[in-house]
Each structure stands twice: as C-alpha cells, then as structure tokens.
Amino acid sequence: MNQFDLKNRTALITGGAQGFGFDITKKFLNSGANVIIWDIDEKKLQNSIKKINNSKLSYNVADVSNFEKINQTVLEINKKTNIDILINNAGITGPTAELWNYSINDWNKVIEINLNGTFNCCKAVVPNMIENNYGRIVNISSVAGKDGNANASAYSSSKAAVLALTKTLGKELAGKNIAVKAVTPSGAKTRILDQMTDKHVKFMLSKVPRGRFLELQELSSLVCWLSSEENSFSTAAVFDISGGRSTY
C-alpha cells in the first residue's frame, strides 16, 4: 500500500487500540506521523504500544463521552504539541433488537459514545486547529448511517447523525485550512462483529455486491489520504467505502 506524507504531523485517534483504529494507527506511523491513541481500556492501549513498538506512538486512557476529562487531556497535549489530525473512530454497535424492544439505557449508551463522543472530541480539538489554521478531521461513520440497518436503530441513527455533524462542521470551518470528512465503511472483520448475531452478520454480507467484508488496510489507506495535506479542497464530504452497497 502507498504511503502519504504525514511527517511532522500529530494525529489523535480515538478507539485506536483495536479494529479500524489500530490499523489506522499503524498506517499513520508508517507515513511519518506522531500518533496519540485513546481508548477506555488501558490494558488494550498498553498491548498496542507493545505490538507496534514505535517511539512516535503514545496513549491516553480516555472516555470520549466525558467532555470535561477529554478537554483537559487535549489542553495538556496542546502544551506540548498541536493536534493536526483528529480521527473520530471510537464507537460501539449496541445490541441487536427491534426498536420497540430496544432499552433506553442501551440507546443512550450508543448515542453517548458514537455521536456525543464525536462532538466532544471535535469541540475539544478544533479551537487549537483554528489557532494554527490547519487541521484534518475524519469521522468514522458507517454505511448504516446512510441506509439504516434493521435491528440496529441506535447504531444507524448515531452514524447518520455523525454524517450531519461532519457536513455542518465542515461548512463552519470551510474558510480555514481545516477539512472535515466522514467515511462510511461497510462491515469489516473486526471485534465489533462479535457483538452481533451470526444471522445479522450474514445479512450484512449479503448486501455487499463485492461479496466480501472490507479489509482493514483499505479503510486505513483512505483515511490516511483524507488526513494528508494533499487533500486540501474537499470538506464537509462523505466518502463511501462499502463495496458497492451504497452508491451515493
């Protein structure tokens, strides 16, 4: 896979200890970036650090649903370096159930992490980007946010809202050298599939014309390009990577 020039850039990747986030982390490091990964699970963060073994990689234990704490963490980071790139990747699927059987607590938890977490991280990081007149933000949404997945109302709704947030923030920052994009991957073989029933996984795969799940490196390459200085004109846009499932 080709590399993009991210030298002298610092990237913050939420949910960076596993799945999409872990693969994006490796891609960014190979492209020369300094990378800070966030996750709520410190053991997974420490394991990621050991696996990669790169001096340009560091971590913070962070709950993206808690604005006060992550804002304080960002302020501490900004004392040492600017955050040039923000990848909002942290997310959960929640249970598989019809809307009328979906618990209020489960609904709120999915929205808190997937939507509010994205809002919180943008709110904390953007002021420093504005001050430096540079930034790249990529929000990891989902094809479910475009098409809606049956029995996944909270997840689909949260990811649809992330697309609206991306378009809004992108327009608000369009007059500055800060670009905001979202990507809408279809299902990939990550731990998030373990939260779903086999029936639901087979249903997801049946809707992908390419007939397979997304490879992690395919997404990380797209995210890396979107995060590079080369990608300077596009903003408030959604980039599809669903194997033909969604064509808009």
Question: Over which residues does each language-model region extend?
Answer:
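Canonical Rossmann dinucleotide-binding motif of NAD(H)/NADP(H)-dependent dehydrogenases/reductases
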Residues: F4-N34
